[in-house]
Swiss-Prot record:
One of its GO terms (cellular component) is cytoplasm. It comes from the Bacteria. GO terms for molecular function: uracil DNA N-glycosylase activity. The active site is at D64. SMART domains: UDG (SM00986), UreE_C (SM00987). It comes from Mycoplasmopsis pulmonis (strain UAB CTIP) (Mycoplasma pulmonis). Its EC number is 3.2.2.27. The lineage of its organism: Bacteria, Bacillati, Mycoplasmatota, Mycoplasmoidales, Metamycoplasmataceae. InterPro entries: UDG_fam1 (IPR002043), Ura-DNA_Glyclase_AS (IPR018085), Uracil-DNA_glycosylase-like (IPR005122), Uracil-DNA_glycosylase-like_sf (IPR036895). The keyword Calcium does not apply. Excises uracil residues from the DNA which can arise as a result of misincorporation of dUMP residues by DNA polymerase or due to deamination of cytosine. Belongs to the uracil-DNA glycosylase (UDG) superfamily. UNG family. Keywords: Cytoplasm, DNA damage, DNA repair, Hydrolase. It catalyses: Hydrolyzes single-stranded DNA or mismatched double-stranded DNA and polynucleotides, releasing free uracil. The gene is ung. This is Uracil-DNA glycosylase.
Length: 221
């Protein structure tokens, strides 16, 4: 089996685990039935659907989805809305500082995912208007197991850890086989600590060049 096939096998086994099928998924079924939950149910695992795991290069870890209408669609930090959420606005500020000529016509990061960037939130769902409402329901176990699987079954992946919730996973990543880039979270509350000026996007492409992988085209046409 290639990496994509092995990943799908792991993914199906994970969804059969007791915490997932007996706790997390019944909770989500009830939430989607009775409340407004983001992203749409069919988009929960879009971050995995859009990445070819034979070409996985980068894992960027977020927190939980955006809480307003027409924003979250299954990719961490990405949005369908024309108006950019503040964290994404700061991401684009840093990106433009790294690459002044970058073209950013929307906040939809699908083109990044298609180049091998897994945009993974720590928690994959949220109730409308209520940040962190789906923490401690099982998503943390799931995303921990995903990161653990990638760490053990892939090589030379660049893990981008923005903020404490992402950095909590640092101890579970094999330093010898992977690269770790970290800074404060790009939210307005913490971007000035170490996110701005981190040159994260330049660093990602410099590493990819060093390991003979195709660099990321950051343009969003």
């Amino acid at each position: 089996m290639n990496k994509e096939q092995r990943w799908k096998s792991f993914f199906e086994k994970e969804k059969a685990q007791k915490y997932f099928k007996d706790e997390l998924w019944p909770f989500l079924e009830n939430e989607y039935k009775n409340k407004i939950i983001f992203p749409k149910k069919e988009d929960i695992f879009k971050a995995f659907d859009l990445v070819d795991f034979n070409n996985l290069k980068v894992v960027i870890i977020g927190q939980d989805p955006y809480i307003n209408e027409n924003q979250a669609h299954g990719l961490a930090f990405s949005t369908l809305d024309f108006l950019l959420p503040k964290s994404l606005k700061n991401i684009f500020i840093e990106l433009k500082n790294n690459y002044p000529n970058v073209v950013l016509k929307s906040g939809n990061l699908t083109s990044w995912a298609s180049q091998g960037i897994l945009l993974l939130n720590r928690v994959l769902s949220v109730e409308k208007g209520l940040s962190s409402s789906h923490y401690n329901r099982g998503w943390e176990i799931f995303t921990f197991n995903v990161i653990d699987y990638i760490s053990k079954n892939f090589e030379n992946i660049i893990f981008v850890l923005w903020g404490k919730k992402a950095q909590d996973l640092k101890k579970d990543i094999n330093f010898k086989n992977h690269f770790i880039l970290e800074s404060s979270h790009p939210s307005p509350f913490s971007a000035n600590i170490s996110f701005f000026g981190s040159q994260i996007f330049l660093k990602i492409n410099k590493i990819l060049e060093q390991i003979n992988k195709e660099k990321i085209n950051w343009n969003i046409e």
